[in-house]
């Protein structure tokens, strides 16, 4: 049984893998599977009082469970998007379309997806794509 549950509606604005140093540190892994949703598409259905927030920056509010410490999502208010950790969404099929921040990768991935040095231009990045 989970202390916190959430649901999303519609489709994510972006889904992929992030290789940035912040995600590596936060997830204790070389790659983080992300799904970015419009803020209005994400709803806490259980345990809202059990959610704590770590304000990494004014553009990044990390949400985690007070009971187990599990990572839930990161709110990016400037972009009006919420990064819900893809593996938390029951029934959600993660269909990645890109690699973000591949310039700081710890491991190489050969999967044919575009690999952005930082972020796609639509998310405020350079849009520069690196070789597969």
Which residues make up each language-model segment?
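A short Gly-Trp-Pro
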Residues: 3-132
